[in-house]
C-alpha cells in the first residue's frame, strides 16, 4: 500500500488546482473536500485527514484538494459554484490515472459542494458526507440520490444538527447509513478517531467488486 502523499496540480479552464495524492494500485479512489475556506478550511483539516486515512488504509488512491483560492490553488472563493468545477476537475484527473471506482467524500462546506454538483459527477460511485451544514447553507435542492451512502454528524453539532439531518435522510436516500458521534461538535476535536473508524467500517462492509 502506498504510504505517502505527493503534491499535484491539475488544470480547470486555466486555473491551477492543488491537491495531495496518494496513488495506490488498482481502480479504487476517493476525492475528499474540505470545509469553508472563508473560515479557515483547507485540505489539511483534521476531519479531512481522518477520512483520507480510513481510505488509504484500505488501498484506495486518495486525492484531497484545496478549493480555488485556498493554499496554492489559483482563483478565488466562488460561493460554491466554481468549487463544484474544482471537484469535477479532480474526478477527471483520477480518471486519467485509470481509476474507475471513485468515491466522493466531503466535510461541512465540502459536503455541500459535493452535493450541489452531484448530478453532474457521473464518475462518482458513492458519496460520504460528514456534518453537512444543513443549519448554515440551504440543502433543499438535494433530492433522492442512491449514491449517498454514509452521513456522519456530531451529537452537539449546531451547524449540522443531527436532528435536522435525520429529517432529510428519507428524501436523500432512505438507505443511508447515519452515524452520530456522541460528544462531538462541528469541529470533532478529539473525535476524529471515531470518524476514521466509522468510515473504515463503512468501507469494510461495502463490496466494491475490486
Regions found by a protein language model. Give the residues of each.
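Catalytic histidine neighborhood in serine/cysteine hydrolases
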Residues: 171-187
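Catalytic histidine-centered segment of alpha/beta-hydrolase-like enzymes
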Residues: 75, 184-196
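Short beta-strand/loop motif that positions the catalytic acidic residue
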Residues: 145-146, 150-153, 157
